[in-house]
UniProtKB/Swiss-Prot annotation:
Its main location: nucleus. TFIIA is a heterodimer of the large subunit 1 and a small subunit gamma. The keyword Protein biosynthesis does not apply. It comes from Dictyostelium discoideum (Social amoeba). This is Transcription initiation factor IIA subunit 1. The lineage of its organism: Eukaryota, Amoebozoa, Evosea, Eumycetozoa, Dictyostelia. Pfam families: TFIIA. TFIIA is a component of the transcription machinery of RNA polymerase II and plays an important role in transcriptional activation. TFIIA in a complex with tbp mediates transcriptional activity. GO terms for cellular component: transcription factor TFIIA complex.
Length: 310
């Protein structure tokens, strides 16, 4: 029984069961069977598009459609057995493919020390022969792996190949390119030092131009060699002598101590409660004070007074 017949049998069996359930169920009794037939044709068309079955109009289909209208008890047991045998054969083929892949990949690429120990041969051959055979097999495997890796590396870009397969250096640790790099680095260091020396020299020259050796700043004169200030400083005093200047703290800076202090004839020293102003007049309410009037001192608790503010 072919794979096409298995797929078609499954489709027709499902559709037959759906129709039987619709007939037996009161809720779905009014469902039209043409809808179920459309579902069947759509299913078969999808299988045909995917390539699971060869052609929908197969002569086996006509026989299968006739059997779909019949009840399940009228199907032959031989057809069931053929379908079951086909499914079992497919399962066995799948299991065999899985076991073969696992057995081949389990020992692939393992070193010799991880391989299972080999039994001695009963005909008296030495185990060294077996070990040599095993080493030869490992060498063959390694050669095959290297050839496969080299073929894979050829498909990679040149940058990746240079990283994965670096070129060994057989002419010694140092070569001319290394010496050239060292010389270039030394020349760069010397240039940097020369630049620093030139910068320091320029800074020192500028400092000497603007400052004298005592550290005083030299202010450049931009208004000519001779001006009025220079003449005043040099020619005051007749014959160009220096003008005597008064030192700080001399008598000229002191105030005249000979002037007498002003005499105050009348004064009041007290606290005030209120001061009101009317034009240039002041009305004051004093308390708790002392007043000096006409050469007499008088204490008071409260006092009122009027003054004219000039």
């Amino acid at each position: 029984m072919s794979v096409d017949s298995v797929y078609k049998y499954i489709v027709f069996d499902v559709i037959r069961n759906i129709k039987s359930n619709i007939k037996n169920d009161s809720d779905t009794e009014n469902v039209d069977e043409s809808i179920i037939d459309e579902i069947q044709t759509m299913w078969l068309d999808r299988l045909t598009q995917t390539g699971a079955i060869s052609n929908q109009n197969d002569p086996d289909e006509t026989t299968a459609t006739t059997t779909t209208t019949q009840p399940q008890s009228t199907l032959s047991t031989v057809e069931h057995e053929n379908v079951r045998n086909t499914l079992n054969s497919l399962i066995q083929l799948n299991n065999k493919s899985q076991t073969t892949t696992t057995t081949t990949t389990s020992t692939f690429g393992n070193p010799q020390q991880y391989l299972p120990p080999q039994k001695e041969v009963s005909n008296g051959t030495s185990p060294t022969m077996n070990s040599s055979n095993g080493s030869n097999n490992n060498n063959n495997n390694n050669n095959s792996n290297n050839s496969s890796n080299s073929s894979n590396n050829n498909n990679l870009p040149s940058s990746l190949r240079s990283i994965m397969n670096p070129m060994p250096q057989n002419d010694g640790t140092l070569d001319e390119s290394d010496n050239d790099d060292d010389n270039n680095n030394n020349n760069n260091d010397n240039d940097n030092e020369n630049n620093k020396d030139n910068i320091d020299k320029l800074i020192i020259d500028g400092f000497k131009k603007n400052f004298n050796f005592n550290g005083d700043e030299v202010i450049p004169q931009n208004d000519g060699l001779n001006d009025d200030d220079d003449l005043d400083d040099e020619e005051i005093g007749g014959g160009g002598g220096k003008v005597e200047e008064d030192s700080l703290g001399s008598d000229l800076d002191d105030d005249d101590d000979d002037d007498p202090d002003p005499i105050i004839e009348h004064f009041v020293l007290c606290q005030y409660e209120k001061v009101s102003r009317i034009k240039n007049k002041r009305k004051c309410n004093f308390k708790d004070g002392i007043m000096h009037l006409n050469g007499k001192d008088t204490l008071f608790n409260k006092a009122n007074g009027e003054m004219i503010w000039n």
